[in-house]
Amino acid sequence: MSENLLRVQPIRNGTVIDHIKPGRGRKILEVLSLSGSGTTISLLMNVPSKKQDRKDIIKVEDRELSENETKKLALLSPDARVNIIRNYAVAEKKKIEIPRIISGTVHCSNDNCISNNERGTSTQFKLMDSKSLRIQCIYCVRKIDEEDIKFI
């Protein structure tokens, strides 16, 4: 019996997000608002990996991630890699990192925080622990764990 393989076509131009934590691909599509963008998107889930047991991969045609989207991606899957594709070749490889200060991408869960009540006040968080992903609002000092992070 011959083995049937599912093959995903290479993209001419766009972004490939590789080494995503397994099971995080859908959440990344949602947070980055990619699923309704009108462009072709491929999501591969639980793909075998040499570096990590399993991984997700996202391919987005004709689009490159903004700096703000890359910051959100770092919070969702810090070990992910972003590859910019131009004319079917990798033109640029980006290793993402969680910034020490996270500005304007995460909502503070404290309803009384100044960042939720003052116009023009951007949210700012300090990275407390990169392994368990714990952040702290610099205004109200509220600590937020990974599972409670809400993106703006």
Give the location of each predicted region.
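Cys/His-clustered metal-coordination modules, chiefly Zn-binding fingers
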Residues: 88-152
